[in-house]
Amino acid sequence: MKQIEKRGEALGISKLLMMENAGAAVARYVIERFSPLTDKHIVIVCGTGNNGGDGFVCARHLAALPASLEVVLLGSRDQVKTAEAKPNLEIILRMKSLESYDADSANFSQQFEKSINKSDIITDAIFGTGVRGDIKEPYASTIRLLNQSKAYRVAIDLPSGLDPATGYAPDPCVKANTTITFHASKKGLMGNREIVGELVVAPIGIPPDAEFSH
């Protein structure tokens, strides 16, 4: 997928645009699946990389809806450094139409647990394709909390912890009700229904030309 993204960039499609399309696709799924969203509480749980960036975009697209919306960053703001995720976080921080907090916030653990316990929909934007192997603390406890929730869990690109190449699912690994992956499915998502849930493949504007090197 990284090579396809690079070839997409060579065609003039920026990673920032791909992130915009990815986050918007997740927001569309939530709107179509759960509308009307009145009285629904949505928590978007974001890591500090580009998977988190997809979550920031998703939150922006959902902000105008009649749902209660929280964005939680599992890290410090200064840990978000990629050229795609950082500007999208900065937009979230300037928005008054949603609530956001990060791991540096006072009483973070208690606030996060409260958010998850009252949620109806959780969007998992913690880890993407770059994380392999067993999940360490504090992320392991975070994932367990998500899995214990009665909320509907939507994973962005893949459930956090799942190896996209081999399908290895460490304990813990997010157990999604729906996984929205982008452009094409990934080998590790196949045959893992108890982790992946319903699998949706969403286009993000990468043309067929990017599939092959020229």
Regions found by a protein language model. Give the residues of each.
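A cross-family phosphate/adenosyl-ligand binding-site feature
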Residues: 1-122, 127, 132-137, 187
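YjeF_N-associated NAD(P)HX repair module
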Residues: 119-214
